[in-house]
Regions:
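Conserved phosphate-binding/catalytic region of the ribokinase-like
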Residues: 78-79, 101-102, 127-230
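A short acidic, often aromatic-flanked loop/helix-cap motif at beta-alpha or helix-coil junctions
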Residues: 11-15, 96, 124, 170-172
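Short loop/turn motifs at secondary-structure junctions
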Residues: 1-3, 53, 111, 141, ...
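Short hydrophobic/aromatic-enriched beta-strand-loop microsegments
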Residues: 4-6, 112-113, 163-166
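Conserved N-terminal subdomain of the carbohydrate kinase-like
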Residues: 1-59, 226-230
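Conserved beta-alpha-beta core of the PfkB/ribokinase-like small-molecule kinase fold
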Residues: 56-136, 143, 152-154
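Short, acidic/turn-prone active-site loops that include or flank metal/cofactor-
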Residues: 9, 35-38, 93, 120, ...
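Alpha-helix termination/capping residues and helix-transition junctions
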Residues: 48-51, 109, 139, 193
Length: 230
């Protein structure tokens, strides 16, 4: 399970966000979302003391679409100056990267440690049109980039080098949640002290499990079985 610390409810009137996910027979998905209260996060909602004790601060790229949310992100990053918290950013969507490039560049200026994105998001971030060129651009960055590429596996670009982790051949029925599962598994393995290439292999395995089921979550016993691979 998950230990929840410092979570509070400050607004009982604004509705929660909702997301309708449509999955086609080829396992692709599209979403129709209303963000609700999730686009109104403010710094008064954040317990900076708890944040500064965290091992990882994970930022969703979608946070750039709301001025309130973006301000909360930058205030949080400001508060982490001098603390040992690792900072990770998910690019979330290639259209978001294209549309809010200046805000992404602002976040990246805070010495982000890890950037997660898929093939299309990596091309958007680097302004390239193929994955090889994107990797070459990312080799010059001072953050570690992890690029997912569906059944082809993933790339870890760090310190001027690119590490390829092969994917697992499975029959996908729903890709909803695969990127989040990958990032969560990668960071979990990292916090367990695993090497980067081991984190990539474990994250590929976790993502291969979630695409074989409908919905973005596994059952409790499936998570337990998965953790035995670490």
């Amino acid at each position: 399970g998950i230990d929840h610390i410092g979570i509070s409810s400050n607004d009982q009137n604004t509705p929660t966000g909702k997301c309708l996910v449509l999955v086609t027979p080829d396992a692709a998905r599209t979403m129709c979302s209303t963000l609700g209260i999730s686009e109104h996060l403010s710094e008064k909602d954040i317990n900076f003391e708890y944040l500064q004790k965290s091992k990882v601060f994970y930022i969703e790229g979608y946070m750039v679409t709301s001025d309130s949310n973006f301000n909360s992100v930058t205030k949080s990053l400001d508060s982490l100056e001098g603390f040992g918290t690792k900072k990770a950013l998910s690019l979330s969507n290639d259209g978001i990267v294209h549309g809010f490039r200046e805000k992404f560049e602002k976040i990246l200026s805070y010495r982000i440690d890890f950037v997660f994105g898929n093939h299309d998001e990596a091309l958007a971030l680097t302004k390239t049109d193929n994955i090889d060129d994107a990797i070459e651009v990312l080799k010059e960055k001072d953050f570690t980039t992890i690029i997912t590429d569906g059944p082809n596996g993933s790339f870890i670009i760090t310190d001027g080098d690119a590490i390829k982790s092969n994917g697992f051949e499975v029959e996908a029925i729903d890709t909803n949640g695969a990127g989040d599962m990958f990032a969560g598994a990668f960071m979990h393995a990292m916090l367990m002290g695993k090497e980067l290439h081991e984190c990539g292999v474990f994250a590929n395995l976790a993502a291969s499990k979630i695409v074989q089921t409908f919905g973005p979550r596994l059952k409790k016993e499936e998570y337990q079985d998965l953790s035995e691979n670490l």
